[in-house]
């Protein structure tokens, strides 16, 4: 069991230079794409956080478990409340639309919480099932209309829904850029859900095989015209959960594991009709994503 308290963590995002033409472009995009404009602004993040980690297997991490075990990870953090209170005392009435600042630098204000649970079921010494659920929610308020870019959630990739490349899924049913390319700025959200079940088997030497099914997506808390279809709604979100399946190889080097995964899209929430279910008529060039990861 491990507890960690971060009393003060300071992060300053500084843009050294923006040309006047680029600044005019960002200003023109502020209504259509607020996420893009916010990503190129100076910002101070002063956060306080607490995290809790527990593994029933003790010091042995769940990389290649040898018995039934489970792990829990929880984290909560907040940023900007003390700075906001101090700014209210010094400058109680800023002009309409202006942020509170510290030394002329806007600061972020938000609260964020994450929870992860993983359970390992041993079938025999060579075979096991692992179930994982991860949930995260972050809410910007007060001095922030949007989370700092590095605090937003992303979906797809080796540790998420593996039928999609990293940061290429969501939010919701957002389709990405008009030209079909990945849109890292807008394909981010304030809410994240990841579900995973994986069958693992020892092959030979230090190699293990895996077969998996992943599900999940991300969503935004506030409606944004630049992320159309990304808003979280209780009566809609379950229809927007993406599903993937695939196979993987694990090279267990004791001190770390090399993971190689190939995922295929099974349910694509962005599409409609028959295209929504690529599992029925899979197309390798369209539905496949390869992932490599190192687990320490």
Language-model features: where?
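Short beta-alpha connecting loops at secondary-structure transitions
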Residues: 98-99, 149-150, 229-234, 241-243, ...
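Outer-membrane beta-barrel "beta-signal"
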Residues: 251-256, 282-296
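C-terminal beta-signal and adjacent terminal beta-strands/loops
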Residues: 215-232, 255, 263-281, 296
